Curated annotation (Swiss-Prot):
GO cellular component terms given for this protein: cytoplasm; Holliday junction helicase complex; Holliday junction resolvase complex
InterPro entries named in the record: DNA_helicase_Holl-junc_RuvA_I, Hlx-hairpin-Hlx_DNA-bd_motif, NA-bd_OB-fold, RuvA, RuvA_2-like, RuvA_C, RuvA_C_sf
Species the sequence originates in: Thioalkalivibrio sulfidiphilus (strain HL-EbGR7)
Region (Flexible linker) residue spans: 144-153
Function summary: The RuvA-RuvB-RuvC complex processes Holliday junction (HJ) DNA during genetic recombination and DNA repair, while the RuvA-RuvB complex plays an important role in the rescue of blocked DNA replication forks via replication fork reversal (RFR). RuvA specifically binds to HJ cruciform DNA, conferring on it an open structure. The RuvB hexamer acts as an ATP-dependent pump, pulling dsDNA into and through the RuvAB complex. HJ branch migration allows RuvC to scan DNA until it finds its consensus sequence, where it cleaves and resolves the cruciform DNA.
Entry keyword DNA repair: yes
Key words, A-Z: Cytoplasm, DNA damage, DNA recombination, DNA repair, DNA-binding
The protein, known as: Holliday junction branch migration complex subunit RuvA
Length: 201
C-alpha cells in the first residue's frame, strides 16, 4: 500500500495530476479541494494517498490532508458509493459542510452533487452519521477552505468544464455552470469552485 508521496508536481488538470518522485512519475486522481492547495508545477508536494485496486486497474488517489483521506475511505464503504462518487463529494463540498449535511439530515444539499440521487443521499446520512465520530476531528471541525495559488491554465474555461464532466456532470450542464461564472475568475480552479458553490445555493 502506498500511503504517502512527496515529490515535484509535473502537471495538473483536474482531477488528474502527475507527481515526480525521484524520477518515477505517479499519475494521481485528487478531489478539487486538494487541487486548490497545489503549488505551481515545479513545486514540491506531499500527498496522503489511497491505492484503489480494481480488476482492470490500480488507481492512486491523493489528498492534501490525512483527515480528507480518512473521509474518502469511509465514504467508499457506504453501499452504492464508489471511489468516483466519493471524489465528487469531496470536490463539491468541504469536509465540514458534508459533516453538517449528514448530522442535520440535509438530503436536499447532497442530491445537488453530481451522481447522487435521493436514495443514495439518504443512505449517506444513515451510514455516515455513526462513522463520523470515528474520523479525525479535522473532518468535522475544519472548513477546508480553498487556498494557495496555482498556475493559470492555457484555457481555464475548457479545463474547468472538463473537470466538471469528469466529476459526473453532463457536458451541457458543465458548460452552463462555468459560463455563469466565467467573468468572475481567471483560473480554472476558481471557476470550478464558484460553479460548485452556486449549485449548493
Amino acid at each position: 500500500m502506498i500511503g504517502r508521496l512527496r515529490g515535484e508536481l509535473v502537471s495538473k488538470q483536474p482531477p488528474f495530476l502527475l507527481l515526480d518522485v525521484q524520477g518515477v512519475g505517479y499519475e494521481i486522481e485528487a478531489p478539487l479541494s486538494t487541487f486548490y492547495d497545489l503549488p505551481e508545477p515545479g513545486g514540491q508536494v506531499t500527498l496522503h494517498t489511497h491505492l484503489h485496486v480494481r480488476e482492470d486497474a490500480h488507481v492512486l488517489y491523493g489528498f492534501a490532508s490525512e483527515s480528507e483521506r480518512a473521509l474518502f475511505r469511509s465514504l467508499i464503504k457506504v453501499t452504492g458509493v464508489g471511489a468516483k462518487m466519493a471524489l465528487a463529494i469531496l470536490s463539491g463540498m468541504t469536509a465540514s459542510e458534508f459533516s453538517r449535511c449528514v448530522m442535520d439530515g440535509d438530503v436536499a444539499s447532497l442530491v445537488r452533487l453530481p451522481g447522487i440521487g435521493r436514495k443514495t443521499a439518504e443512505r449517506l446520512v444513515v451510514e455516515m452519521r455513526d462513522r463520523l465520530g470515528s474520523l479525525p476531528a479535522a473532518v468535522t471541525l475544519t472548513g477546508g477552505k480553498p487556498a494557495a495559488a496555482a498556475a493559470r491554465a492555457p484555457d481555464p474555461v475548457s479545463d474547468a468544464v472538463s473537470a466538471l464532466v469528469s466529476l459526473g456532470y453532463k457536458p451541457q450542464e458543465a458548460s452552463r455552470l462555468i459560463s455563469a461564472v466565467e467573468g468572475e475568475a481567471e483560473r480554472s480552479e476558481d471557476l470550478i469552485r464558484l460553479a460548485l458553490k452556486a449549485t449548493l445555493k
